[in-house]
Amino acid sequence: MIGIDIVKIDRVTSAKSKFKSKFIYKFLLSSEVALVKNDASLAGIWAAKEAASKALGCGIGAELSFLDIEIYKDKKGAPKLKFNENIVKKFNIKNTSLSITHDGGFAIAAVIVEN
């Protein structure tokens, strides 16, 4: 399955300003906080998690939370994602691929989940 999401970076900036750290910890794991260099990278992580939820066909909600998905970087700095063990079993996930890009004030992510 494929999931794609686009987020306006200014929208993330506004939410961060309004809700402060509550906003960040609503969807970031502690391991992901270090990845946030600016609002564009924060928006990229948000888009990646939304795209991952769409690739599973369930969205963020009762079956899957933002905190069930971890975004990290490999040795070359490329973004990767993994789901927690319960989600891997529930959706029979075998492999994942992630791409994040930024352009024109937007963060865009595409995720492929193989079962």
UniProtKB/Swiss-Prot annotation:
It is found in: Cytoplasm. SUPFAM superfamilies: 4'-phosphopantetheinyl transferase (SSF56214). InterPro entries: 4-PPantetheinyl_Trfase_dom, 4-PPantetheinyl_Trfase_dom_sf, ACPS, Ppantetheine-prot_Trfase_dom. It is an enzyme of class 2 (transferase). GO terms for biological process: fatty acid biosynthetic process. Its cofactor is Mg(2+). The keyword Transferase applies. Mg(2+) binds at residues 5, 50. Keywords: Cytoplasm, Fatty acid biosynthesis, Fatty acid metabolism, Lipid biosynthesis, Lipid metabolism, Magnesium, Metal-binding, Transferase. It holds the Pfam family ACPS. It comes from Campylobacter fetus subsp. fetus (strain 82-40). This is Holo-[acyl-carrier-protein] synthase. Transfers the 4'-phosphopantetheine moiety from coenzyme A to a Ser of acyl-carrier-protein. GO terms for cellular component: cytoplasm. It catalyses: apo-[ACP] + CoA = holo-[ACP] + adenosine 3',5'-bisphosphate + H(+). Belongs to the P-Pant transferase superfamily. AcpS family. Disulfide bonds: none annotated. GO terms for molecular function: holo-[acyl-carrier-protein] synthase activity; magnesium ion binding. Its EC number is 2.7.8.7. The gene is acpS. The keyword Magnesium applies.
